[in-house]
């Protein structure tokens, strides 16, 4: 399952930084759940699988809580360090995430979680490009 692979890869890539972990795991991956869950719920509803709809609705509400907590802690850390949360989030994503932060976005549920559009619009992670170019990484000698 590619989504789980991406989640675990991001967990490894952000292991050394709480800010990066909160930004990438909670405010990118889990926020993406806010975007895709409503369409998934609707597909199950159209198929008549109301039991799955109920479960997915609970999961969706839980996802809003995860993003809210991630946003709260990320913002708190940034305030303690005297840095701008939006600029810091965008920097963390550019440096430690691979690929675009994809829409369409569920702006209403992202806003409920505290994430305004300034966080995620027109944002692309460059981690894979940086790794391939060796930018920001120590070169390792191969024996």
Across the structure, where does each feature detected by a protein language model lie?
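Non-heme di-metal
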Residues: 1-143
């Amino acid at each position: 399952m590619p989504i789980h692979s991406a989640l675990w890869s991001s967990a490894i890539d952000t292991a050394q930084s709480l800010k990066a972990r909160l930004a990438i795991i909670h405010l990118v991956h889990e926020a993406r759940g806010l975007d895709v869950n409503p369409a998934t719920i609707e597909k199950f509803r159209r198929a008549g699988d109301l039991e799955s709809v109920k479960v997915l609705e609970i999961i969706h509400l839980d996802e809003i809580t995860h993003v809210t907590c991630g946003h709260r802690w990320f913002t708190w850390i940034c305030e303690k360090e005297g840095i701008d949360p939006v600029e810091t989030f965008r920097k963390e994503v550019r440096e430690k995430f691979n690929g675009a932060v994809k829409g369409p976005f569920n702006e209403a549920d992202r806003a409920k979680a505290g994430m305004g559009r300034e966080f995620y619009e027109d944002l692309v992670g460059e981690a894979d490009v940086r790794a391939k170019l060796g930018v920001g990484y120590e070169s390792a000698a191969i024996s």
